Amino acid sequence: VSGEVPGTDGGPMTSSEGGVRGRALTLAGVLAAAETAAPVESLDVVARILREHLGAVSVSFLITDFTGGSVVRLGAAGSVDTGEPARRITLRDTLYDDVIRTQQPRVEETGEDRRVRVVAPVTNRGDAIGLLELFLPAAPDAQVMREIGESAHALAYIVIANRSFTDVYQWGRRTKPLSLAAEIQHRLLPASLACEAAQFAVAGALEPADHVGGDTFDYTIDRDTVQL
């Protein structure tokens, strides 16, 4: 369900109405801010920027799990309990599922204090890493949606860069305990299970993700060929 909820002047909310006045959010700006923080705190930096700039009531990042059928909401730095499986949110027939499948952001009325919910895909070259979810005081205008899209794109790069330095993202993807064979097999898979370009698209997955029997796949891209 999409809806137009008025801003302060009866129209859609602009970024200047939502929070801190100033320049529009850009991919480069969000990346630069995240790089000043420790790898486990980069998500918190992006969330704080969005809260301050857009006046968002809440901002969260949801990462896709190994099964591809669920997402996991990652909290503030240090809140991931590695001793227990992460709490999974099943995707089927949800707004999250729609956003991941269509790779288009969605705006939904919540019915609470005229707030709206915005969910944007966090994707890099077809690799669906997760989702950016915000609750805003009013419906966003086109500029705000562009800024949210830029921030979601920045999050994809942030996760890709920082998952080499911390296990927070890996633990978030483990909604089921992995067998030893599955742990080893996942380490041998491509870092990104999908790649989309103008000339081709390739994607793969292991099923079941938590227990494998030796199957694997890989791909590499040369200037003129894709090798599988």
PLM region spans:
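Structured interaction and signal-relay segments at domain junctions
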Residues: 31, 35-36, 43-104, 110-111
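Signal-transmission linkers at sensory-effector interfaces
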Residues: 1-36, 161
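Flexible loop/coil segments at beta-strand boundaries within sensory signal-transduction domains
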Residues: 67, 122-128, 222
